[in-house]
Amino acid sequence: MEYITTIGLEVHVQLKTQSKMFCACPVEYGAQPNANTCPTCLGLPGALPVLNRGAIEYTVLAGMMLGCETPPVSKWDRKNYFYPDMPKNYQISQFDLPLCMGGHVPLYDHCYPKDAQKDITRSGQSIGLTRIHLEEDVAKSTHAAAGTTIDFNRAGTPLMEIVSEPDIESPEEAFAYLNSLRQILIYGELSDADMEKGQMRCDVNVSVRPPGQEELGVKIELKNMNSVSAVRRALHYEIERQVAVLKNGGELIQSTRRWDDDLGETQQMRTKEDAHDYRYFPDPDLLPVRTAEIIEKMRPRVPELPHQKAARFVEDFGISEYDASVLSSDLD
């Protein structure tokens, strides 16, 4: 019996701003540990956040490029949890009024893995988006045998979270989605989206269910994948693991697992939290954002997108759609 796979992706993208989301500290990859910090991004008592308008503008532009709707008002919320890389013990994020709603990411054929080109079943389709919201990044933890160190240079970096609908049906489609999304972000000069540098990170939600069952299966979240290829490998393993559990009469529990690329397997981290566990509430230190002026400012900056450039190449030069898509994959 073939099980049905359902996949949704949460992609976190560091924006190419010069300063952090709520303070003036510079955003600089590779700086000396804890060099770019201040009382605000260290969460010291009495320090107040100040919005980075550039990060808001970039997020609205991303929404325009991806066909999202931007509501007239967006607000900020506190996501409450305790972890060493979050100095305030809450993260400033967005809950019920994000900057962007809806939208889609097109699946270009050339974005699929080369060894899966012949198996593309949904050519020209798009993956729906639930929302795009803006938040602050957390610090970077480095784990070693002697202990864990934390670098707060990354804490407070503007982080755009792009949440897909559960529309993805295979690891290969997830691979294509991430490549296509990365291409669009680079076109808009919103981010370098280098996964090895942590500028683009992906959490995967995956479930399986038997044919004929309408209700989605138990959702398992996967973390710790530092490349698009690793996402594909992790999904292949996890789908096989879940199917094996169900076929053997076992029960899946909603949880979070980490991918170990060296061992080629996922490992249990914790049972999964729900949104109510974070006790979101509006941030009292930040005013809501009215977006009308920002939308009008960013509208002229929407670039020609990859699929639009590819269509122009086909019309102007008479080349094949595949060749045009390959040529348009590079911004230059």
Segments predicted by a language model, with ranges:
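Histone-fold and other basic nucleic-acid-binding segments
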Residues: 311, 315, 322-332
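Basic, nucleic-acid-interacting segments
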Residues: 1-304, 315, 319-321
